[in-house]
Amino acid sequence: MKYIKVVFVLLIVAVVYACATNPFTGKKTMAFVGNDQLFPSAFAQYNQVKSESKVITGTSDAEMITRVGQRIAAAAERWLVANGNHGYLDDYQWEYTLIESDQVNAWCMPGGKIAFYTGILPIAANETGVAAIMGHEVVHALANHGQQRMSAAYLQQGLAVAGNVALASDDQALGIFNQSFGVVSNVAGMLPFSRSHETEADKVGLILMAIAGYNPDEAAELWKRMKANSGSSSTPEFLSTHPSNDSRIATLQELAPKAKEEAKKFGVTSFRPIN
């Protein structure tokens, strides 16, 4: 019993002290892995992906990805500085890569390494659509969502170990715990946790694209195209790490006017044409 208490105390101490501050909410978040470890690992993975992929350079699409990325990064810098987060991006090493692939995918690694796959460009449809995707993915990195997911996974593993230690003398209870813990912790904890990241990335991503001069109204149109591309098959929202397409579209439509108001604070009163 004494050992069990020690395990739980160590978990509590880890959660309390291993924290970082989300620059968009000001709230403390779990950070068992620091940027000094996370960024080099992300950069190495990025270089590996590039070495194993067909990277497109010198085309109008590749130039667009870089152009939009630079504008979103500049918007993020302006927004962060205006909200008191000076120097937050000092360790970022922005890079923008277009990869030839049918995958409908794009991502931004911790530290600012961004990849777009050609398969997502028809759904983006235009430069403003690319900006909507870019803003969303950049926020995942800036808000430390990857770091939080890794930390939550470590905590989940720690709780599983603690549960096994606590129930080691009761085979029946231990069996029930191991059968149910993964499902319960995912549905009640990890999945809503991931959905909250998606919602935050949508909200702040709209602001960044608006500050960069792109019309945030296009984000909802992008997700209508994404919904059409995904067809009728969809996972129930409570079992998904992402909000449903309909929920996301409604949220984006509601938040777009607020993003425009935020952009006005940075002198943005009109947006680039959508074409």
Name each model feature, range by range.
Residues 2-8, 17-275:
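A Zn2+-metalloprotease active-site environment signal
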